[in-house]
Amino acid sequence: MQISAALLCVLLTAAAFTVHVWAQPDGTNSSTCCYVKKQKIPKRNLKSYRKITSSRCPWEAVIFKTKKGMEVCAEAHQKWVEEAIAYLDMKTSTPKP
């Protein structure tokens, strides 16, 4: 009977740690997005972007930050998204007089 109680304690402890590990984030940024905007955003309204990859989402996403401070998710492989990224990269690499 003592062996059964000890075994039960070990199993419950192991189960508790397993649940704790599964509940941990996967190491990505907390602002991951799986719901993306399909509509094109004008480049002149964009300020910056960051790429997001997460095991929780089936695709790569980009989070654009607008000049008004809003964050908008978009699928990274859409043509307008690639053009917007190239535009922002060029804009930030161009030296200002």
Curated annotation (Swiss-Prot):
UniProt keyword annotations, A-Z: Chemotaxis, Cytokine, Disulfide bond, Glycoprotein, Heparin-binding, Inflammatory response, Pyrrolidone carboxylic acid, Secreted, Signal
Similarity-based family: Belongs to the intercrine beta (chemokine CC) family.
Name of the gene this protein is made from: Ccl7
Annotated Pfam families: IL8
Role: Chemotactic factor that attracts monocytes and eosinophils, but not neutrophils. Augments monocyte anti-tumor activity.
UniProt-recorded name of the protein: C-C motif chemokine 7
Record organism: Rattus norvegicus
Record has Glycoprotein as a keyword: yes
GO terms (BP aspect): antimicrobial humoral immune response mediated by antimicrobial peptide; cellular response to ethanol; chemokine-mediated signaling pathway; cytoskeleton organization; eosinophil chemotaxis; inflammatory response; positive regulation of cell migration; positive regulation of natural killer cell chemotaxis
Subunit text: Monomer. Interacts with TNFAIP6 (via Link domain).
Glycosylated sites: 29
